[in-house]
């Protein structure tokens, strides 16, 4: 059994370098919600050095709110913006001797694409247009996964160690109670349950089926790094290989 561990990089966190020693995939911010050409280059170099799979992390053009505010953009605009961001990171990755493997949308773009078919289709279409070999990462069971499969892309279904789930398998919005799991034991138990048994307990108590192919780790701060180390160790202890 294997599991991919992914983390978002190039978003201004001081812990990026250490996080790259723990994860198997890196999602690199492409300049819209965070990052710039130089942070993208630095992140790619570190990922190549650590043998970590490189992916683009496109977001809404919303630096002020870190890409976490809902935006109602036409699908053709989202398509063009996604192409633009993937293309920029692909060029930098190529120049640094790496290979871009996947695309994972950021923040509210990710959340809206999980539920809005037109937005999901625009993103999947852009990924396919850039390179049909790219893997599309999205919330397990979401519209984005459906759209990726529709375009013939390989998809990777993502679960979250530190986020609460609703009964329909969607994440509890950050604005609501129960959105973030701050207890390390609870996060660890939830993640192992999702990976080993394919289910998650919602905040209302129901067990919801979920397919876990990659686990998102948030790496900001020493506490997050300590949890990342502990989670990786827990997988290895159970014979679960960590690899992209």
Curated annotation (Swiss-Prot):
Protein EC: 3.5.2.9
GO molecular function, one term: ATP binding
Lineage top rank: taxon: Bacteria
Known catalytic reactions: 5-oxo-L-proline + ATP + 2 H2O = L-glutamate + ADP + phosphate + H(+)
Record keyword ATP-binding present: yes
InterPro entries per record: Glyco_hydro/deAcase_b/a-brl, LamB/YcsF/PxpA-like
Example GO biological process: carbohydrate metabolic process
Keyword line: ATP-binding, Hydrolase, Nucleotide-binding
Keyword Protein biosynthesis tagged: no
HAMAP family for this protein: PxpA
Family affiliation: Belongs to the LamB/PxpA family.
General function of this protein: Catalyzes the cleavage of 5-oxoproline to form L-glutamate coupled to the hydrolysis of ATP to ADP and inorganic phosphate.
Assembly and interaction partners: Forms a complex composed of PxpA, PxpB and PxpC.
Record's protein name: 5-oxoprolinase subunit A
Annotated source species: Escherichia fergusonii (strain ATCC 35469 / DSM 13698 / CCUG 18766 / IAM 14443 / JCM 21226 / LMG 7866 / NBRC 102419 / NCTC 12128 / CDC 0568-73)
